[in-house]
Each structure stands twice: as C-alpha cells, then as structure tokens.
Swiss-Prot record:
Its cofactor is pyruvate. The lineage of its organism: Bacteria, Pseudomonadati, Spirochaetota, Spirochaetia, Leptospirales. This is Aspartate 1-decarboxylase. Substrate binds at residues 57, 73-75. Its EC number is 4.1.1.11. The active site is at residues 25, 58. One of its GO terms (molecular function) is aspartate 1-decarboxylase activity. Belongs to the PanD family. Catalyzes the pyruvoyl-dependent decarboxylation of aspartate to produce beta-alanine. It holds the Pfam family Asp_decarbox. Is synthesized initially as an inactive proenzyme, which is activated by self-cleavage at a specific serine bond to produce a beta-subunit with a hydroxyl group at its C-terminus and an alpha-subunit with a pyruvoyl group at its N-terminus. It comes from Leptospira interrogans serogroup Icterohaemorrhagiae serovar Lai (strain 56601).
Length: 116
C-alpha cells in the first residue's frame, strides 16, 4: 500500500513579498529549495503561521542567496510581507519500503531566510 509522507519542509520562512498580478506560484530562494530537497515546479503545501491559511501551489526559482519568499497570484491574498510560513513537499512511497529511520529534510531559517 502506498502512503504519503512529508519529503521536505522549509520551516517558518518569512514572506518577503506578495505579487497579486503575477500568474501564480511561490518564488523561493534556490538555496532553500535545494537544501529541502525540493524542485522547481513541484507542488507544495503552504501554511501561514500568522493567519492559519493553508493552500497548495508550486515552486518557481528565486535568486540564490536572496532569501526571497514571494507569494504570487491568488496566493498573495493569503499572506503578506512579514508573515511566517511553512512550505511542505510530500512523496508517495510503498509503506513496506519506508525505512524505520526515514527522516524528511527539514530546513530551519533565520529572520532573513538564511539556513540555520
């Protein structure tokens, strides 16, 4: 049987911008994307710690080392600059293949979205 498990997480990133007029998605600094084992265009769940909003979108490439976390398109209505968010990816795995020591990649960031 397949189960869905958390694959990666960027924990308590700070939203640096929100662009309602962009076509959609979530712009994320590529250093954070790589550290969390995520990919550009991968589906993500986003949880806004400040207002409780939860939504799904996909990642687009942000400049490396910029700390950029930008809510684009309709997602811009679900958060604002300065909000803390959690970005989560998932994977489908065969339950019997899931190692007992499985650990997802979790990236903790500081107030400027630099990996701690």
């Amino acid at each position: 049987m397949q189960i869905t498990v958390m694959k990666g997480k960027i924990h308590r990133a700070t939203v640096t911008d929100a662009d309602l007029n962009y076509e959609g998605s979530l712009t994320v600094d590529m250093d954070l994307v790589d550290a969390a084992g995520m990919r550009v265009y991968e589906k993500v769940s986003v949880v806004n710690v400040n207002n409780g909003a939860r939504f799904e979108t996909y990642i687009i490439e942000g400049k490396r080392g910029s700390g950029e976390i930008c809510l684009n398109g309709a997602a811009a209505r679900l958060g604002m600059k300065g909000d803390k968010i959690i970005i989560i990816t998932y994977a489908q795995v065969e339950e019997q293949e899931l190692a007992s020591d499985y650990t997802p990649k979790v990236v903790h960031v500081d107030e400027k979205n630099r990996k701690r």
